[in-house]
Amino acid sequence: MSRMCEICGKKPMVGNNVSHAHNVNKRRFNPNLQKVRSLQENGQVKKITVCTNCIKSGKIVKP
């Protein structure tokens, strides 16, 4: 699925834009996703879409 972290499953959230006059419009909060080369368990290198929180916390192994 696009716009989804392949490690933790983080997806876009739905919220509101609120103006000073308190007019409300729907908006989406997208996770910060990056395409990263990752070392798989079988030794292969694969490109996966991962959020920056997973990269920072070391949940993926870079080749």
UniProtKB/Swiss-Prot annotation:
Keyword Ribosomal protein attached: yes
Key words, A-Z: Ribonucleoprotein, Ribosomal protein
GO biological process per UniProt: translation
Entry annotated with the keyword Ribosomal protein: yes
InterPro entries: Bacterial_rp_bL28, Ribosomal_bL28, Ribosomal_bL28/bL31-like_sf, Ribosomal_bL28_bact-type, Ribosomal_bL28_sf
Pfam families linked to this entry: Ribosomal_L28 (PF00830)
Domain of life: Bacteria
GO molecular function: structural constituent of ribosome
Gene3D superfamilies noted in UniProt: 2.20.150.30, Ribosomal protein L28/L24
Entry GO terms, CC: ribonucleoprotein complex; ribosome
Family, similarity comment: Belongs to the bacterial ribosomal protein bL28 family.
NCBIfam families, per database record: L28
PANTHER family cross-referenced by the UniProt entry: 50S RIBOSOMAL PROTEIN L28, LARGE RIBOSOMAL SUBUNIT PROTEIN BL28A
Name used for this protein in its record: Large ribosomal subunit protein bL28
